[in-house]
Amino acid sequence: MVAGVFLGAILCAAAAPFPEKPITVIVPFAAGGGSDTFVRIFLKAIREHDLAPQPFVVKNIGGAGGTIGSRAALKAAPDGYTILCLHDGMYTAQHYGNADWGPADFTPIAATGRSGVVVAVVENSPYKDLAELMADAVARPYQLVYGTNLGAPNHYSALFLQHGKPGAKFRFTQTGGGAKRLAQLKGGHVDVTGFSVAEYEPFKEAGIRALAVLSEEREAALPDLPTAREQEVDAIHGLMQFWWAPKGTPPDRVAYLEKLLRRVMETSTVQARLAQLHVDPEFHVGDDLQDVIQERSRELEGLQLEKPAALPPVHWLVLGFVGLCAVWVWREDKPA
């Protein structure tokens, strides 16, 4: 009898409608950023078009280039009530060594949208096109400073650019997000940096100039901007947005989320906003999604990483400096 009751409880749980409570979407970056904006567009469409019986709630867990949030998703219960939206940072953090987990440690739900990447310099830069920039990167290796967020997708866009011109070498420096990269570029602290097309649009009036886009074809938003390949640099890279569930999430719940995201992508709300943000409305699920994930993982294998040498901890530097000062004062005060 007890066994029958237990079996009945299992069957009832399996037959329970999903979702029965709000679903949390972890955004592994601060509120107001590009990823946060992207997710909120989708959740707004779910509400406005009444596509789900329960609300979807954003939970921002920023820090460490998205790895704190992705780790939280990794450890979440695999019940479909906690999911993650994270772009190619899922791949790059693992490849760079910032995380010991990656795509294989999650169940992919869907890929929704691709953004092009623009290579930009300050308006008065001596480089008139990408060919000139890359020729100088070959002639003077490690002299041109490329502003990036080390280990993040924009860093990998720069690595693909460098890889696309044999002999080219940039000196990569940590600058942070788009607004910080813009400030570093305008301030003359870096020679070149990269932005998504969506980032570049509002920035282009701020005294910067695009040299190329790292897409297979010219971007509709920037029809006069040539691709890298048009300038004899074999570099293609873009930013894809992915939705992930914890490993072990029941297939029927993953299927529900997949179908929901497909319906969301088809809404006028999302289509209009993605167009405004210059995001291509690509949509990948199932075997197609697996192919995309495997291809993007393979693309990283041929990249050469040159990590900056680690500096000693700051407190040791301070102690060393204080010690030197103490010795100098002691020697000055010592009687002759």
Feature annotation, model-predicted:
Residues 11-15:
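Sec/Tat signal peptide C-region and signal peptidase I cleavage site
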Residues 16-105, 150, 154, 164-194, ...:
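N-terminal (or domain-start) structured segment
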Residues 1-10:
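Bacterial N-terminal signal peptides
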Residues 323-336:
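C-terminal membrane-anchoring or membrane-association module
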Residues 20-22, 252-325:
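An extracytoplasmic/periplasmic, membrane-proximal ligand-sensing/linker region
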Residues 88-90, 114, 124, 197-198, ...:
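Solvent-exposed coil/turn segments that connect beta secondary-structure elements
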Residues 104-112, 147, 169-173, 191, ...:
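Short beta-strand->loop
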Residues 72-82, 95-180, 230-233, 240-273:
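Hinge/capping helix and adjacent helix->loop/strand transition within the periplasmic-binding protein
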